[in-house]
Swiss-Prot record:
Origin species: Mycolicibacterium smegmatis (strain ATCC 700084 / mc(2)155)
Protein family: Belongs to the 'phage' integrase family. XerC subfamily.
GO CC field: cytoplasm
Function per UniProt: Site-specific tyrosine recombinase, which acts by catalyzing the cutting and rejoining of the recombining DNA molecules. The XerC-XerD complex is essential to convert dimers of the bacterial chromosome into monomers to permit their segregation at cell division. It also contributes to the segregational stability of plasmids.
Protein name from the UniProt record: Tyrosine recombinase XerC
Top-level taxon: Bacteria
GO process annotations (BP): cell division; chromosome segregation; DNA transposition
Residue numbers annotated as active site: R151, K175, H246, R249, H272, Y281
Domain Tyr recombinase: 107-294
Ranges where the Core-binding (CB) domain occurs: 1-86
Chief location category: cytoplasm
């Protein structure tokens, strides 16, 4: 069974262009499924997977308290896997074809207020005044994530040549290997210049290659390190929600819309395939307006 899962993992990476994070999620979901199959049938085999068994698997997880979002993701993982197995001739009938994806309740993302975002940026900028390479790198991480709204995996995957400093744009390779160009402002440009001229040369080693961001040992920065940087930076801001890079992405999108940006432009900047995903941020701004109205209007 593991060899089949290895083949599916290769398909997700090479043909679907999924990130390592997404592929690990698929692998975890399918491993959990086949643990259940083996427990129920005594065989760890694709041939033993049936629609009733899949429904029992999801029902058991639901009864154990799995969130609706988790159930929806696992259903999607299984449906993608079974459809692939059918095309490869590994099964004659797709047992997941009629499996319904539970609708996940969409929750409004936690975002920073504008003043909180500026406080976080001020803090990370003040910490980079001494020329310490790690501080200069951390400044760039936060500035670039907020300026562009890119994903942390996209940030850590950037090479130096992906940055056009004269035009102040970054070329991003997003989900599905789709490339997009995202602009950034003067504060991020200043952070980038300081990192490239003062910070990166202090950490660079032959193994650094073209990577834009480096870890303390000179190799390409791991997304987990970038997440830690964002969490630590934001946690120092009084009253700010506990967010990481994805929360900073949410914040950038929300502030763009609050500033009057067109929804489809924001969709393009974020690399969303569906406009419906971007529209979630309009609900955030409406909720904020409602909160202000409730507090300030005498007839609220």
């Amino acid at each position: 069974m593991e060899s089949v899962l290895d083949q599916f993992d290769a398909y997700l990476g090479l043909e679907r262009g999924h990130s390592d994070h997404t592929r690990r999620a698929y692998r975890g979901d399918l491993t959990a499924l086949f643990d259940f199959v083996e427990q129920r049938t005594g065989e760890r085999s694709l041939a033993r997977v049936s629609l009733p068994l899949l429904r029992s698997w999801l029902a058991e997880q639901s009864a154990s308290g799995a969130a609706r979002t988790t159930l929806a993701r696992r259903t999607s993982s299984v449906k993608t896997f079974c459809a692939w197995a059918l095309r490869r001739g590994l099964i004659g009938v797709d047992p997941a074809a009629r499996l319904q994806v539970p609708k996940a309740r969409r929750t409004l993302p936690a975002v920073l207020r504008r003043d909180q975002a500026l406080d976080a940026l001020d803090a990370v900028n003040s910490g980079a005044q001494e020329g310490d390479p790690i501080a200069l790198r951390d400044r760039l991480i936060v500035e670039l994530l907020y300026a562009t709204g890119i994903r942390v995996s996209e940030l850590c995957g950037l090479d130096i040549d992906d940055i056009d400093t004269s035009r102040r744009v970054v070329r991003v390779l997003g989900k599905g290997n789709k490339q997009r160009t995202v602009p950034f402002g003067e504060p991020a440009h200043a952070a980038l210049t300081a990192w490239l001229t003062e910070g990166r040369p202090q950490l660079s080693i032959p193994e650094s290659g073209p990577a834009l961001l480096l870890g303390a040992r000179g190799r390409r920065l791991d997304p987990r390190q970038a997440r830690t940087v964002v969490h630590q930076t934001v946690s120092a801001v009084n009253g700010a929600p506990d967010i990481g890079p994805h929360g900073l992405r949410h914040s950038a999108a929300t502030h763009l819309l609050e500033g009057g940006a067109d929804l489809r432009i924001v969709q393009e900047l974020l690399g969303h395939t569906s406009l419906a995903t971007t529209q979630l941020y309009t609900h955030v701004t409406v909720e904020r307006l409602r909160a202000v109205h409730d507090q300030a209007h005498p007839r609220a």
